Amino acid sequence: MNEPTPLSRSFGYQSVDEREREQRIRRVFSAVAARYDLMNDLMSFGIHRLWKRRFVRMAAPQAGQHIVDLAGGTGDVAALMAAADRRVTVVDPSAEMMAVGQARGHAHVDWQVGSAEQLPLADASVDTLTISFGIRNATRIDVALREIHRVLKPGGRFLCLEFSTPAWWLRPFYNLFSFTVIPRLGAWIANSPEAYTYLVESIRRFPDQRGFAAMISAAGFESVRWHDLSFGIACVHVGTRAAAATPAGTA
């Protein structure tokens, strides 16, 4: 029996080398940037906006924090967390996606080009790092998780909103919609059926809730847990970087 292609060398159901995977994914987001948010509305019937608001409530942004929204794209999640009394930064490898967000004039949001596997951030410099619907596009998810752990302050929190594995009774309907409707919407709205075929296939290749939680724990995070949304169609994983140890005799 053939072993499944590692995620780092898969573009949806296709086997490619890591370099080719990175290039293809960047081309996908460059091609769909202008219609990305509209497609999300159509594909999810607008429910992704409710998921993101729930996600931001879980992130609980506070005054004085440095918050990074990784793979933040057009900045819709960052805009929900932004305020004058905190620093919110979108880090994304796609300049085209960020340009769409910058044109919208989101207040109190900074923008920085960077990849999840090599974050342009100092060690222990971030209070909260969020990522929504982006971690499965990282070529080396294990490396990305270690990088996220590196840049978080002790006690800092990582929150990831991602498509996941829905309840068994929902899967036949979910699969029918995903493989028939979504690529057609991609062709009609974004003129990019290939991009949305990749989207659907990449979701199926991504680990389920328990499997991804294990990856987060393996990267060094503590108190890892998850919360299903819409019967598991999407899921929020949360992990914490361990707080700094108190030196003996100082308590």
From Swiss-Prot:
Q: Which cysteines are joined by disulfide bonds?
A: none
Q: Give, as one word, the top-level EC class.
A: transferase
Question: Example GO biological process term?
Answer: methylation
Classify the source by domain of life. Bacteria
- HAMAP family the UniProt entry points to: MenG_UbiE_methyltr (MF_01813)
Q: Please give the family membership noted in the entry.
A: Belongs to the class I-like SAM-binding methyltransferase superfamily. MenG/UbiE family.
Annotated protein name in UniProt? Ubiquinone/menaquinone biosynthesis C-methyltransferase UbiE
